[in-house]
Amino acid sequence: MNEDYFLRLARRLRIPVARAELIHDREGRAGLVVQRFAGVLVDGEVRALAVEDARQLLGRYPADQYSLTSEQVSTAAATSCPARAVAARACLAQFVFAWLTGNGDMHAKNLSALQEADGEWRIVSAYDLPSTLPYGDRSMALSLDGRRQALTRKAFRSFGTGLGLPQRAVERTLDDVLRATDPLLDDLRGGALPLNRNATQDLVRQLARRRQDLEE
C-alpha cells in the first residue's frame, strides 16, 4: 500500500513516526492499522492525552485547514513546545519529506502537538504520509515561501530559518531528508507502489526533479 511504504521510508528520518502495520483479511484485502498516539497506559488503563492540530492551535475553523500557510502551521506547532528548536526541526523535516515524496495533502490537521503524561508538549509522530502525486496532485496542500509548486532548496532554507532554526541546522535537516529518501526512486522503479509502467515512470521523473532542486 502507498502509505505503508512511505511510513516505513519516513522511519529513516531522525524524527518520530507513527507505528503502523499492513494486514490482510481472509479475502486477501490489505488494510493499514495505525497505532493511536493520543493515549498512554496507566495502571492498566488507557489515559487520553491532549492533542491539538495546527488549525486548532491557531484558533481557526475546520474549513481553514487548506487555507493556512506552512509557516503559520509550523510556527504554531513549534511554539507550543518547550523544546522549540527540536519541534521546528521536526516541522521542517515533515514538509521537506512531503515535497520529496509527492504528498500533496500535508494540511493544517496533519501537523499536531501532543501533551505527554508529564505535561510537556511535543510534535506528534509523523502520520498520514501517502504520496498523492500519482493521482494528479502536483502541488503542496499549503503554500511554502509563497508557493505550492516548484519548491527549491532556497525556499526550504527560507522556511527553516523563518522558524528560528540556525542556517546550519536547516542545511543539515535538508541533507538528512535527502539521505533518508535516497532509496525512493529505485524502490519505485522496483514496484514499491502498485502503479502501471507509465505512471511509475512519470512519478520517478517528477520526484527526481524535486530531488535535484533540493540538492542544488
Task: Describe each region flagged by the PLM.
Residues 16, 83, 164-167, 194:
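Short coil/loop linkers at secondary-structure junctions
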Residues 67-71, 88-92, 172-173, 189-190, ...:
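Short coil/turn segments at secondary-structure boundaries
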Residues 53-76, 113-171:
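Catalytic-core segments of enzymes that bind and process phosphorylated/nucleotide-bearing substrates
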Residues 79, 120-123, 162, 188-216:
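Regulatory N- and C-terminal appendages and interdomain linkers associated
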Residues 25-27, 91, 172-183:
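Small/polar glycine-rich anion-binding or flexible loop at a beta-alpha turn
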Residues 31-36, 182-188:
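A short beta-strand motif that forms the metal-chelation/ATP-contact edge
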